[in-house]
């Protein structure tokens, strides 16, 4: 619509059907400033609504809250009663053979595979960012604000990530390890963890 209007006015100018009074008229300038603005607003409003609808997950099988601290992560499984833990990087001298240095944690995030997972992410002190590239997830953790993301793992495995927002001296020592397991394994893990934390 905008291109058609511009081409039409250009054709009229080339054919000299517009006088110099019309070419310099403020009415024409006002129209071709306001008309594109209206078209852009009409395009933006439905797009914003769709953008927020895409971010919402209707019925997740599991909701997990991640809280960034200097310099570790806390996790709360909000669908379970009193199921929460802190996740610290394992120091290199304590690392078992075969584990990745600077990437392994003492408590992994365990999730059921092939289940929609909603992550609610925040921070307790400074800006952090919960990022697991192999899951396609990177969400900022901001103090006083809850950010949300969702994902589904299609296979069992271990997925590594890290805080990707510079948050202080030990920023590089905030690894994230997500372990995707079949549902029966997840259920036994969660019941074992909730029993041991009581």
Curated annotation (Swiss-Prot):
Q: Where Cu cation A1 is bound, by residue?
A: 128, 163, 167, 174
Topology class, membrane: Multi-pass membrane protein
Catalysed reactions, as listed in the record: 4 Fe(II)-[cytochrome c] + O2 + 8 H(+)(in) = 4 Fe(III)-[cytochrome c] + 2 H2O + 4 H(+)(out)
The main enzyme category here is translocase
Cofactor(s) demanded: Cu cation
Give the EC number(s) under which this enzyme is classified. 7.1.1.9
Care to name a GO molecular-function term for this sequence? cytochrome-c oxidase activity
**Xref: Pfam families:** COX2 (PF00116), COX2_TM (PF02790)
- Assigned keywords, A-Z: Copper, Electron transport, Magnesium, Membrane, Metal-binding, Mitochondrion, Mitochondrion inner membrane, Respiratory chain, Translocase, Transmembrane, Transmembrane helix, Transport
Where is this protein found?
Answer: Mitochondrion inner membrane
Q: Where does Mg(2+) bind?
A: 165
Q: Which residues cross the membrane?
A: 1-13, 27-54
Instruction: Give the binding site residues for Cu cation A2.
Output: 163, 165, 167, 171
> Which of the residues are on side Mitochondrial intermembrane?
55-198
Query: Which note does the record give on the cofactor?
Result: Binds a dinuclear copper A center per subunit.
Question: In this UniProt entry, which residues form the Mitochondrial matrix topological domain(s)?
Answer: 14-26
Describe the task this protein carries out: Component of the cytochrome c oxidase, the last enzyme in the mitochondrial electron transport chain which drives oxidative phosphorylation. The respiratory chain contains 3 multisubunit complexes succinate dehydrogenase (complex II, CII), ubiquinol-cytochrome c oxidoreductase (cytochrome b-c1 complex, complex III, CIII) and cytochrome c oxidase (complex IV, CIV), that cooperate to transfer electrons derived from NADH and succinate to molecular oxygen, creating an electrochemical gradient over the inner membrane that drives transmembrane transport and the ATP synthase.
Q: How does it assemble?
A: Component of the cytochrome c oxidase (complex IV, CIV), a multisubunit enzyme composed of 14 subunits. The complex is composed of a catalytic core of 3 subunits MT-CO1, MT-CO2 and MT-CO3, encoded in the mitochondrial DNA, and 11 supernumerary subunits COX4I, COX5A, COX5B, COX6A, COX6B, COX6C, COX7A, COX7B, COX7C, COX8 and NDUFA4, which are encoded in the nuclear genome.
Return the PANTHER family for the record.
CYTOCHROME C OXIDASE SUBUNIT 2, CYTOCHROME C OXIDASE, SUBUNIT II
Describe the family membership recorded for this protein in Swiss-Prot or TrEMBL: Belongs to the cytochrome c oxidase subunit 2 family.
State the protein's name: Cytochrome c oxidase subunit 2
* Naturally occurring in which organism (per UniProt): Tinamus major (Great tinamou)
**What gene makes this protein?**
MT-CO2
